[in-house]
Structures are given as C-alpha cells and as structure tokens.
A protein has these predicted regions:
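Alpha-helical transmembrane segments of multi-pass small-molecule/ion transporters
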Residues: 1-309
Length: 309
C-alpha cells in the first residue's frame, strides 16, 4: 500500500493528464465539480494556517510586487501592439491568456510539492493565502479591461466578477478559521490546551483533490482544443507565450528566494515529516525552492474557471 501511494505521488501529474485527455468524452461533463473542488482545496490548505502565527517574509512581498509589475507590463505591451497594428493584429486572446498565467494565485497543492522538494511548507502556505487575497482584489478590476463589453459598464462588470470570484477565495479561509476557533475553544472549556492541526493524510488532501480536478480540467481542455475556432498559428503563439511565462516565473521566484532568504532558522515539523532531508538544507536553499514554487506553481483550475466566466 505504501509503495502504491508513493507511485501515485510521484507520477500523479502524468496519470491525471493522460486520464483526462483519453477520457475526455466522460470527464468533460464533470465541470460542475470545479468550484466545489477549488473550495475544498483552499479550505484544507488554510486549515494548516493559524492566522495568529502567520510569518511574513521579505520574498513574499517582492514576489507579489514582481507579479503585479509583470501583469501591468504585459498589458502595456499588448495595448501598444494593438495600437501600432491599427486593429489588424488580433492578439486579444493571447493577451488574456498571458495575464491569466501571471495573475493566477499559487496552486493549493504547491505547499505539499514544496515540502517534498525540501522547501518550507509554512512559508509557502502563508504566501498561498496572500496570493489568493491579491487575486481576489485585482482580478475583478482586470477582467473588464481584458474583455470590454459595450453592453456592460466597467464597474458593473467588475462587481459581477467580484461577486463570483471573491467568495470562492475568501470563504474557505473564513471557514477554516471558524473550525480552528471552535475546536480550540471546545478544548479550552474542557480545561485542556490543544491546537488545531491536520495529520499527514488530511494535510495532503489538497494534493489529491488537485489531481482529481486536473483530470476534469484536462478533459475540458481537450474538448475545447478539438472544437477550437482559432488558427494553428494562434494556438502556437498562446502555447509559446504560456511556456515562456511559466519558465520566467519559476526562474524569477528561485532567484528572489535565493537573494532574499527567510530570516528564521531550522525546519518546520511538517517539512521534516514529508522530507526528512529538509533539516539539512540552508535557508537560501529552502527559500529558493519555496519561492520558485510560490511564483511558478499556478492554480490552473481557478484560471480556467475564471476564463470561462
């Protein structure tokens, strides 16, 4: 059983993608599971955070600032190309895709993956919360700009998106906090002090929910590609742009983490539990791994959900 679980953990990404691609006829109809699965992924991720114990790092703010700068830069370059092209270059879809690649929050499974690589689960979980909060605040203002409509005013479109996006990002955090307060309050009334923690199985739950969701998403992506209305060169440009954005974010994240490492010593208990060798990593090594995953690992499920709104 342990060997089977290790195999699934190692090759889960490939297995999920293959199942989703070849089983697209069946799994494409499970799109309604997207929102509940995203909610649960965020809920279990936030359950690992005690809001009173949040530790902010320098690289948290630097990564967020660079992320926003890249988004604004892509928007500026995109609109400049549209202007000089005199409306002949249709790059609106490419522009939307690039912005989504950049602005999407960190994947909920990223802390688990970072832990397996030797990074800091604590620091990345904290950044995941910050990243989701940033997305909830920024995305509603970006979408009306990326997809302007003559029928809906800017602030009306912004409000509609805010009502759809923010609850999915904020409610899991609030629910996790309520569960923690109720659990710890119950034990205090009994005269005992017990902190709310997740065991290894429940702490890994976002990873397995992500795998399940990835199957559904790959099925829907396959269905979309088979019925695509764009020309081949346009698809190539979108894929190339996404690849460049992915490599750039991983590289920048790793550089920022190495250049501005966390200022605390030692390894978190969860890090050692998942990867015993993490205790031997230096602060710079742990921060490089953690920041790289924080910037490069994106919540693809949330991005596709937003793109289909």
């Amino acid at each position: 059983m342990k060997g089977f679980r290790s195999f699934i953990d190692r090759y889960a990404l490939i297995i999920a993608m293959v199942i989703g691609v070849f089983g697209w006829r069946w799994f494409r109809h499970l799109g309604w599971l997207t929102s509940p699965l995203i909610f649960l992924m965020l809920f279990f991720t936030f359950c690992k955070i005690n809001p009173l114990d949040l530790r902010l790092r320098r690289w948290h703010f630097i990564v967020l600032a660079v992320q926003l700068a890249l988004v604004l830069g892509v928007l500026g370059i995109g609109y400049w190309i549209l202007a000089i092209g005199d409306g002949q270059l249709d790059i609106g879809v490419v522009l939307q895709g690039l912005v989504l690649c950049l602005i999407m929050p960190t994947a909920t499974a990223a802390p688990i993956i970072a832990g397996k690589l030797g990074g800091s689960i604590q620091n990345l979980t904290t950044f995941t919360l910050l990243s989701n909060l940033l997305t909830a605040l920024v995305v509603p203002g970006l979408f009306p700009v990326l997809n302007p409509s003559t029928d809906i005013a800017f602030f009306s479109a912004m409000w509609q998106i805010l009502c759809r996006v923010t609850p999915l990002l904020i409610l899991p955090f609030l629910c996790a906090w309520v569960v923690r307060l109720v659990y710890e309050g119950y034990h205090r009334r009994k005269g005992t002090v017990r902190r709310f923690t997740l065991n290894r199985t429940w702490a890994s739950m976002p990873f397995y929910l992500w795998i399940l969701l990835l199957v559904v998403l790959m099925a829907r992506i396959t269905d979309t590609l088979l019925n695509v209305v764009y020309e081949g060169w346009m698809i190539g440009v979108m894929c190339g742009g996404a690849l460049v954005a992915c490599i750039l974010q991983f590289a920048l994240g790793r550089w920022i983490g190495y250049r501005f490492p966390a200022d605390s010593h030692g390894a978190d208990f969860q890090d050692i539990l998942i990867n015993p060798s993490a205790v031997n990593y230096t602060l710079a090594e742990k921060s490089r791994i953690t920041a790289g995953q924080a910037f490069g690992q994106k919540n693809t499920a949330l991005g596709i959900w937003m793109a289909q709104m």
